Every structure is written in C-alpha cells, then in structure tokens.
Amino acid sequence: MARLQKFYKEEVIKKLQSELGLKNVMEVPRLEKITINMGVGEAVNDKKIMDNAVRDLALISGQKPVVTKSKKSIAGFKIRDGWAIGCKVTLRRQQMYEFLDRLINVSLPRTRDFRGLNPKSFDGRGNYTFGVKEHIIFPEIDFEKTDAIRGMDITFTTSAKDNAQAKALLEAFGFPFRG
C-alpha cells in the first residue's frame, strides 16, 4: 500500500468526516483518478517529437500513455482529422497515490518561483486542474536527454460534491495552496 493511501485511510478520513460534519464514512470525499495530459502540437511536423513526449510521460507516470488524435481538421492550426496531437495517461489506485506523493513532496518544490497552487482552479464539481510549464521538475526526467521542455495539465478527479470538500481533501493530503 502506498504511503499516502495508508495516510488517507488512517488519518484523512477521520479528520474530514469530523471537519465536514458527515455522518457516514462513505460520504467522505476521495481521490478517484489523476489524469496527466500533454499537448504536443509540434508533433504534426515531426513524429519523433511525439515519441519523445510519450517516453517522457511514461517515465513521469510509470504507465504507458495513450496518444490522443485530433477529432476534426482545423486549417488555422494546420492539422487534419486523426493526426496525433498529444498524449495522456490516467492513474488510479496505487500508482495514483505514488504519483501524488512524488508530485507534492519532490516535484512541486523543484518548480522555479513556486509560490503555491492557485486555489481558484476548481471546476465547481470537486475537480482540480493545474498546469506545469516544465516537465523537467520531475526527478525521473534527465535534463540532458530531453529534446525540448514541455508543459502538461494535471487533473485531480475527486468524489467531492463541491469545491469546498475537494479543497479540504487536497489540503489534507498536503497540497501547497497559495494564501
């Protein structure tokens, strides 16, 4: 069992149940999945860029990413229907908690000029998304071997009913929110 998963079951559930005034343990919000999305628009011209992005995302997440393809042709972006334009990976269970642990304790503190995560990035339904400008903040990525510095979006999907419950859950895990 991952360290944060054990921490959630032993401490976070009890704390949130009393803090949020919930009667049933099953009402306590939980983290359902983490989705990491990397848009690679430059891959339209060079397929090697997509291969490198997939390799980097696999190293970061510990799981093979799915290549996302464009749904329709857009002349302004010079893309055609079905072309590879990004990659994503969905983490659940053990791998999700291990990634979360590395993200909070190792990667986010390595970010340049990091002042905390924006507390307004909740979607209204208990999910939280933030962007990472440089994927080299993850210790799995060797700066010397990367061809380019890429950004990515990380989405935390929770079972929380609203933003307040989701924020309480993420703060209990130790998310460094601003303010």
Curated annotation (Swiss-Prot):
Superkingdom field: Bacteria
GO biological processes: translation
Annotated GO MF terms: rRNA binding; structural constituent of ribosome; tRNA binding
UniProt keyword tRNA-binding present: yes
Mitochondrion found in the keyword field: no
SUPFAM superfamilies the record matches: RL5-like
InterPro entries: Ribosomal_uL5, Ribosomal_uL5_bac-type, Ribosomal_uL5_C, Ribosomal_uL5_CS, Ribosomal_uL5_dom_sf, Ribosomal_uL5_N
One term under GO cellular component: ribonucleoprotein complex
Keywords, alphabetical: Ribonucleoprotein, Ribosomal protein, RNA-binding, rRNA-binding, tRNA-binding
Family recorded in the similarity comment: Belongs to the universal ribosomal protein uL5 family.
Binding partners and assembly: Part of the 50S ribosomal subunit; part of the 5S rRNA/L5/L18/L25 subcomplex. Contacts the 5S rRNA and the P site tRNA. Forms a bridge to the 30S subunit in the 70S ribosome.
Described function: This is one of the proteins that bind and probably mediate the attachment of the 5S RNA into the large ribosomal subunit, where it forms part of the central protuberance. In the 70S ribosome it contacts protein S13 of the 30S subunit (bridge B1b), connecting the 2 subunits; this bridge is implicated in subunit movement. Contacts the P site tRNA; the 5S rRNA and some of its associated proteins might help stabilize positioning of ribosome-bound tRNAs.
Name by which UniProt lists this protein: Large ribosomal subunit protein uL5
